[in-house]
Amino acid sequence: MVNPGRTARALCLLCLALLLLGQDTHSRKLLLQEKHSHGVGNGTTTTQEPSRENGGSTGSNNNGQLQFDSAKWEEFHTDYIYTQDVKNP
């Protein structure tokens, strides 16, 4: 005979495991998207400027070209120099 309490617990644990697996998969997918869109060191530290039609800013002529995020670039550069100084004093 099947115990209803035991069945409910097993079903609850199964649902919890599925939710955790789904969350892990979603987190990994977001992490991969973040890595691809904000790569470091290979010329991909740029941000897309919104187009003029969408009400975005009117910086550098908005022809779809990528524009460097200078603050982020300076941060990466400073971190790199600091890391090199620590590795090779």
Curated annotation (Swiss-Prot):
Coiled coil: none
Broad class of where this protein is predominantly found: secreted
Annotated localization: Secreted
GO molecular function, one term: growth factor activity
Cysteine disulfide partners in this protein: none
Residues carrying covalently attached carbohydrate according to the record: 42
Modified-residue entries (Sulfotyrosine), positions: 80, 82
PTM statement from Swiss-Prot or TrEMBL: Sulfation is important for activity and for the binding to a putative membrane receptor. PSK-alpha is produced by endopeptidase digestion. PSK-beta is produced from PSK-alpha by exopeptidase digestion.
Propeptide: 23-79, 85-89
Keywords of this entry: Developmental protein, Differentiation, Glycoprotein, Growth factor, Secreted, Signal, Sulfation
GO biological process per UniProt: cell differentiation
Domain of life the protein comes from: Eukaryota
Region Disordered, annotated ranges: 33-68
Tissues in which the protein is found: Expressed throughout the seedling. More abundant in fragments containing shoot or root apexes where cells proliferate vigorously.
Signal peptide: 1-22
An example Gene Ontology CC term for this record: extracellular region
Family the UniProt entry places it in: Belongs to the phytosulfokine family.
Note: The N-terminal tripeptide (YIY) is the active core.
Role noted for this protein: Promotes plant cell differentiation, organogenesis and somatic embryogenesis as well as cell proliferation.
Protein name stated in the entry: Phytosulfokines 1
Originating organism: Oryza sativa subsp. indica
